[in-house]
Amino acid sequence: IVSPPVCGNELLEVGEECDCGTPENCQNECCDAATCKLKSGSQCGHGDCCEQCKFSKSGTECRESMSECDPAEHCTGQSSECPADVFHKNGQPCLDNYGYCYNGNCPIMYHQCYALWGADVYEAEDSCFESNTKGNYYGYCRKENGIKIPCAPEDVKCGRLYCKDNSPGQNNPCKMFYSNEDEHKGMVLPGTKCGDGKVCSNGHCVDVATAY
């Protein structure tokens, strides 16, 4: 059963152009609260691309860029709504070829080390990642049926993340994070560059052309 639209309930329903509540409570200068229609001369009553009852000018930014792989969206000048959030395609090089776009982000190991440990912590030397071939409680590439699968030699940069700590008072060339509560935390993130033209996918270092 579909209830008929009710003007004044602050829900935009079928047949309504706006709904700002009852005439006594309406705070929207663009909307006629008695009819739930836009007032004469108004193009819109709400939305990220609605300013003073008019569509925002074409090109007005309505959603900021979150990363190099997630460009800003801009109003069209024909609608009160911001266009859908779109990303650059997965696999597009980013951050001066240090990474590849993945779902709107540019995952690189340096940023992941920074998120875990803060400043002065960087991606560790390749030798540190060899521990991921052990298949022990922390050094592995993925889990299958609860069993930790060791990394193949070519996949070691798609398992546990290793960082080099250069912060004051620290000298840890192979710093890693492990938690029993969250075993995924401290693993290299999917989509991270693991070699030239290669990214991490399901614990494997694969060609970026075939990953997506």
Swiss-Prot record:
Keywords, comma-separated and alphabetical: Cell adhesion impairing toxin, Disulfide bond, Hemostasis impairing toxin, Platelet aggregation inhibiting toxin, Secreted, Toxin
Domain Disintegrin: 4-90
Tissue occurrence: Expressed by the venom gland.
Keyword Zinc attached: no
SMART domains: ACR (SM00608), DISIN (SM00050)
InterPro entries per the UniProt record, alphabetical: ADAM_Cys-rich (IPR006586), Disintegrin_CS (IPR018358), Disintegrin_dom (IPR001762), Disintegrin_dom_sf (IPR036436)
Annotated localization: Secreted
Family indicated by similarity: Belongs to the venom metalloproteinase (M12B) family. P-III subfamily. P-IIIb sub-subfamily.
Name the UniProt record assigns to this protein: Disintegrin-like halysetin
Organism of origin: Gloydius halys (Chinese water mocassin)
